[in-house]
Regions:
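Non-catalytic interaction/Regulatory regions outside core domains
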Residues: 1-133
Length: 133
């Protein structure tokens, strides 16, 4: 399956995500993206930095205080660990998951429950990790 097919079928095609992009793990190469979903280089740099941040003594990462910018919008970060970043802006949100070689950046609309979006993205991430990506 092509990277674009993962975006179109495994993510957006589920109805649990309305926009998605797949980047390499360094965040400097877009492998696939939904039409009109543009994550700027400086926004990807924020995401990569969040993954590199080991957190303070309590495990709190800087991004949990500063928020995260994706596609021109700022999101409050609700979860940040070595694998996943979850963000929210009003009733819509982000699910970002890092695999061995890729970063899945996804957006869900206010009509989708956050848990449904998270399950969709986390399941694809598990699959990609299982096949070496």
């Amino acid at each position: 399956m092509s990277w674009q097919a993962y975006v179109d079928t495994s993510l957006v095609g589920t109805g649990n995500v309305d926009k998605a992009a797949i980047f390499n793990s360094e965040g400097n190469s877009v492998w696939a993206a939904s039409a009109g979903f543009t994550v700027a280089p400086n926004e990807m740099a924020e995401i990569v930095t969040a993954y590199k941040d080991k957190g303070d003594a309590n495990g709190i990462k800087a991004v949990q205080s500063s928020g995260l910018h994706v596609a021109g919008d700022k999101y409050i970060v609700l979860k940040a660990d070595e694998r996943s970043l979850y963000g929210k802006k009003g009733k819509e949100g982000l699910v970002i998951v890092k695999t061995t070689q890729a970063i899945l950046v996804t957006h869900y609309p206010e009509t989708v429950q956050p848990g449904a979006a998270a399950n969709t993205v986390e399941q694809l991430a598990d699959y990609l990790i299982g096949v070496g990506y």
